[in-house]
Regions:
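N-terminal secretory signal peptides that target proteins for export/translocation
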Residues: 1-3
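Bacterial N-terminal signal peptides
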Residues: 6-16
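Sequence-pattern detector for short linear motifs
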Residues: 9, 50, 143-145
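Bacterial Sec-dependent signal peptides at the C-terminal "C-region" and cleavage site
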Residues: 16-24
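Acidic, serine/threonine-rich low-complexity disordered tracts
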Residues: 23-108, 148-241
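Hydrophobic, well-structured mid-protein blocks that either form specific transmembrane helices
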Residues: 99-145
């Protein structure tokens, strides 16, 4: 399936680190559309963040299009600096008669990461590691704490239950958002980040974040000659606590 799970999880979420106190997380509900070169239709999805009655946070994303459906959910708490510390993560993917589910359990006391469902395994857990969703909120916090200067490189570590992935994002600066905004106003200013891949890689990924609240406005990911584009279409009411 061209719209792979790995691509989809990149939608939904530092040489400058996550030091000091992080910006406060505010519940939200955002609506998105996605297009992929070679497919004659768009997918639609949501991203939402809520704070539960037990004080923990729940970050959810959904994406669906005809024969494809993907759901992700991350449960996390905040560490002493106010940065997300993942506890549980689950993803479910179904389409073309196939189903797949993966669960991650982060045991910080024992420093152990357990993956069940798809390709079960256990690995040591390194402090500061994020799940496939919570890293996006940690990056958003870093931006809201103070917009970094042009060419600043933001680093973080993410795991989907396999070997950790070191992600590096270069700040390209403030630019006009391609195309009209959800309100139909062209030229909205956004902070643009580009992911740095290994030298020689043809893979490209660019993120546009709203200057006002750090919302993800647009994502472009080109891999193997095809472009995946995801854009914000509307903001809704935040989920109730």
């Amino acid at each position: 399936m061209a719209l792979s799970l790995r691509l989809i999880t990149l939608l939904f979420g530092l040489s400058a680190g996550l030091s000091g106190h992080s910006a406060e997380l505010t519940p939200f509900l955002h609506y998105y559309e996605a297009s992929y070169e070679g497919l004659p239709f768009n997918a639609r999805g949501t991203r939402s963040l809520e704070r539960r009655s037990d004080g923990r946070f729940q970050f959810e994303t959904t994406l669906g299009a005809l024969f494809l459906g993907v759901e992700e959910q991350a449960t996390f708490e905040l560490d002493d600096a106010g940065t997300p510390r993942p506890l549980y993560y689950v993803t479910r993917q179904q389409g073309l008669g196939r189903q797949r589910e993966r669960r991650l359990v982060f045991d910080w006391k024992e420093e152990r990461l357990t993956r069940t469902g798809d390709k079960p395994r256990e690995d040591p857990l390194t402090p500061g590691t994020f799940d496939p969703l919570s890293w996006q909120l940690a990056l958003k916090q870093r931006l809201l704490a103070g917009w970094p200067a042009r060419d600043t490189v933001l680093d973080l570590t993410m795991t989907d239950g396999g070997d950790p992935t070191e992600m590096r994002w270069r700040v390209r600066g403030a630019e006009a958002l391609p195309g009209p905004t959800p309100e139909g106003e062209p030229g909205e200013r956004a902070l643009v980040l580009e992911r740095q891949f290994e030298t020689g890689s043809e893979e490209r990924m660019t993120l546009w974040f709203a200057e006002a609240d750090g919302a993800l406005l647009r994502l472009e990911h080109r891999e193997k000659g095809r472009l995946l584009t995801i854009w914000l279409t509307a903001r809704g009411d935040a989920p109730p606590p």
